[in-house]
From Swiss-Prot:
Main enzyme class: hydrolase
Full protein name: Translation factor GUF1 homolog, mitochondrial
Reactions mediated catalytically: GTP + H2O = GDP + phosphate + H(+)
CC annotations in GO: mitochondrial inner membrane; mitochondrial matrix
Miscellaneous comment as given in the Swiss-Prot or TrEMBL entry: This protein may be expected to contain an N-terminal transit peptide but none has been predicted.
Compartment(s) of residence: Mitochondrion inner membrane
Organism name: Ostreococcus tauri
Length: 667
């Protein structure tokens, strides 16, 4: 550590510029992952009173409290607008020298690296409104925009009474814009429409505003014209929140009821909970009880996120803040739980929100089997912070002990993998993704959930009385009118059924399709972007189950099934998928002294095969002339030896080979 610090001081000049090359060089030198967070130098606030304090935050009554969220399609500027609102209210200092605060609420390294919001973040800010001169407490929740993190959006909206619906003025209404609008509408939230990025030369404010009027049914004069980059009309957003969004519907004098919104693990303090007090008052030192588990807690610390944590002794009805208890066990916190005072037995549970339903399953295994306990601890702590992930223990003959994890999509899974590596140092192998199928036995009309290919017999069920149903989704695709033909071809190739086609405006079309989830989860989004040159967007929701000809395809190496490579595919696509995976495995496996046969099979039927030729050893090199029978005898002896090696030898597939094959997208 001393050597590391010494080297950091020596390279301070390079690191002050956040040089990626310098950081990479130091990481390689010390064989460690180094992360640097850059803070802009700041200028003082206009008034010392602008900085929020615990006394000022707790003094705001319920009727002057507003809980709202910013929702939009990915990359439409939610986090950027949130930064300007925080600067405007004095929650963060304005950066000096022309620099701007960026992604203040995106605290995870993976969020800053990818430039997307993964976790919804809540922050309490104070705003003095010009209409009445009163100070208001605004609890702002910045939400993700990608469809894979819709659970974070739904969870955030359950704590809100209004939402700022943001639309990029250069892009217009997108598929996820419509999805988040209906999420907010289902919760009876007040919608504040706003067109963002109006400062850009390519912005078409009137066209986008008319789209919002037509799609969302809002009035044209309700649409705010803002710029998250420059802060244009940011104060109008705050005024609209104060004037249009109602205060929380809670009873400050009632019995305590608090909703557990989120939780994260801290190495020093244990579980740090994000709570919203709905009724009553929560004090530091209170003895509270979980309605779901019946477990008792003592409140050790309370506070507001401003976004800097500010400790307080009390949280009142309508307020959102963090809570630390005397229980460090990560399994004691269940997101969506209702908390109440200990000893009360007639507490009505809060509505909370629906648990997330995993859409994609993957097996996660440690690269080194000795690191399983390390992986177990990492998964346990990370699922506390991301309640939409499910994890069950699983064993594989090829990869050893691991977990079968459920995610909301492939991006969600990829972010989870990155967080395991960056936050806990866990090196993992992820198996091929599969969707949750359902096995139906007609003899007794029972259903069995199937999240692993090994749950299905090789080649399918022998009895016709047993069926497999696959999940369906109803997809909404918004694309330019000139690429509709190629998008229709893509949906047809993915076994889609067209439901509707309509025009959003003169240049863009809305397509609605019913598609198998397995076809969407693989690489549908990437292929959609490729065929539309990046202009098409899509979102989907569950649409039930349907009987389908789904079969298990196995991969055999020298006649031995490799369970980690088993997949569930539609019978019509099994051969194409089989040829693809055996070809990739042939390129990845090292050659041996004997021939290796790589096969893909449906039960006993081989549908694809590749062979890796053996190394040739020149056994006749020591023969200089003489009788030809001597050479033949040596060649026959070599041939017999190779037959014996093929019979008794096992092909050891390295773990990095698994990782390379399973991470490669299909052709």
């Amino acid at each position: 550590m001393r050597r590391v610090l010494k080297e950091l001081c020596r390279n301070a000049t390079a690191l002050s510029a956040s040089s990626n090359a310098s950081t990479t060089a130091l990481s390689q030198r010390f064989r460690s992952t180094l992360s640097f967070f850059r803070y802009h130098s700041s200028v003082p606030l206009k008034n010392a009173d602008d900085a929020p304090t615990a006394d000022r935050l707790t003094a705001v009554p319920l009727e002057r409290t507003r809980n709202f969220s910013i929702i939009a399609h990915v990359d439409h500027g939610k986090s950027t607008l949130a930064d300007r609102l925080l600067e405007l209210t004095g929650a963060i200092r304005r950066a000096s020298g022309g620099a701007r605060n960026e992604q203040v609420l995106d605290t995870l390294p993976v969020e800053r690296r990818r430039g997307i919001t993964v976790k919804a973040q809540a922050v309490s800010i104070l705003h003095r409104d010009e209409s009445d001169g009163e100070e208001y407490l605004l609890n702002l929740i910045d939400t993700p925009g990608h469809a894979d993190f819709s659970f974070e959006v739904a969870r955030s909206l359950s704590a809100c009474d209004g939402a700022v619906l943001l639309v990029d003025a250069t892009q217009g209404v997108e598929a996820q814009t419509i999805a988040t609008f209906y999420l907010a509408l289902d919760r009876n939230l007040v919608i504040i429409p706003a067109a963002n990025k109006v400062d850009m030369s390519s912005a078409d404010v009137e066209r986008v505003a008319n789209q919002m009027v037509r799609v969302f049914g809002v009035e044209r004069d309700e649409v705010l014209e803002v710029s998250g980059k420059t802060g244009l009309n940011a104060e109008k957003v705050l005024s609209a929140v104060v004037q249009r969004v109602p205060p929380p519907r809670g009873n400050p004098d009632g019995s305590l009821r608090a909703l557990l919104l989120d939780c994260r693990y801290d190495d020093f303090r244990g579980a740090v909970n994000l709570v919203q007090v709905v009724d009553g008052v929560l004090h530091k030192g209170d003895k509270i009880t979980s309605l779901a588990s019946g477990q008792h807690f003592e409140v050790l610390e309370l506070g507001f996120n401003t976004p800097t944590p500010i400790a307080t002794n009390v949280l009142s009805a309508g307020q959102v803040g963090y809570m630390i208890t005397n229980v460090r066990d990560v399994r004691s916190s269940k997101v969506g739980d209702t908390l109440h005072m200990r000893g009360l037995t007639t507490i009505e549970p809060l509505a909370g929100f629906r648990p997330a339903k995993p859409m994609v399953f993957q097996g996660l295994f440690p690269v080194n089997s000795d690191d399983f306990e390390k992986l177990r601890a990492a998964v346990s702590k990370l699922t506390l912070n991301d309640a939409s992930v499910t994890a069950q223990a699983e064993n594989s003959s090829a990869l050893g002990a691991g977990f079968r994890c459920g995610f909301l999509g492939l991006l969600h899974a990829d972010v989870f993998h990155q967080r395991l590596q960056e936050e806990f140092g866990a090196e993992i192998i992820a198996t091929a993704p599969t969707v949750p199928y359902r096995i139906k036995h007609q003899s007794d009309d029972t259903y069995i959930d199937c999240t692993s290919p090994l749950s299905v017999p090789s080649g399918g069920f022998p009895s016709k009385s047993t069926e497999i149903e696959e999940p369906l989704v109803e997809a909404t695709i918004i694309c330019p009118s000139n690429v509709v033909g190629t998008i229709l071809e893509l949906c047809a190739d993915r076994r889609g059924e067209q439901l509707e086609q309509s025009f959003l405006d003169d240049s863009r079309v809305i397509l609605r399709y019913k598609l198998p989830l397995g076809e969407v989860a693989a690489d549908f989004a990437d292929e959609l972007k490729s065929r539309s040159s990046g202009y098409a967007t899509f979102d989907y929701e569950e649409a039930g189950m349907r009987k389908s000809d789904i079969v298990r395809m196995d991969v055999l190496v020298n006649g031995v099934i490799v369970d980690a490579l088993a997949t569930l595919v539609h019978r019509t696509k099994a051969q194409r998928h089989g040829k693809d995976i055996v070809a990739r495995l042939k390129d990845a496996l090292p050659r041996q002294l004997y021939e290796i046969a790589i096969q893909a099979s449906l039960g006993s039927k081989i549908i694809a095969r590749e062979d890796i030729r053996a190394f040739r050893k020149q056994v006749t090199s020591k023969c200089y002339g003489g009788d030809i029978t001597r050479k033949k005898k040596l060649l026959e002896k070599q041939k017999e030896g190779k037959r014996r090696m093929r019979r008794i030898g096992n092909v050891d597939i390295p773990n990095d080979t698994f990782a390379g094959i399973l991470s490669t997208k299909r052709d």
